[in-house]
Amino acid sequence: MAKAPKGKAKTPPLMSSAGIMRYFEEEKTQIKVSPKTILAAGIVTGVLIIILNAYYGLWP
């Protein structure tokens, strides 16, 4: 059975990915918005667009 040379060690993990993870771990100030808020904002925006289209005569 062939063995790996003694001088070679396992390759270390990529440093770039470690840097990205460290960047996201350092981020403390975040705007936290619940999924329900995003859904409600989308529905309100859609209804507002429909109402404005009907009011200004753009409704087919």
UniProtKB/Swiss-Prot annotation:
Using the UniProt record, give the first listed, main subcellular location: membrane
Topology within the bilayer: Single-pass membrane protein
**An annotated GO BP:** protein transport
**Regions crossing the membrane:** 35-54
Q: Which residues lie on this side of the membrane: Extracellular?
A: 55-60
Signal peptide (residue range): none
Residue numbers on the Cytoplasmic membrane side = 1-34
Q: What does this protein do?
A: Involved in protein export. The function of the beta subunit is unknown, but it may be involved in stabilization of the trimeric complex.
Oligomer and partners: Component of the protein translocase complex. Heterotrimer consisting of alpha (SecY), beta (SecG) and gamma (SecE) subunits. Can form oligomers of the heterotrimer.
To which protein family does this belong?
A: Belongs to the SEC61-beta family.
Q: What is this protein called?
A: Preprotein translocase subunit SecG
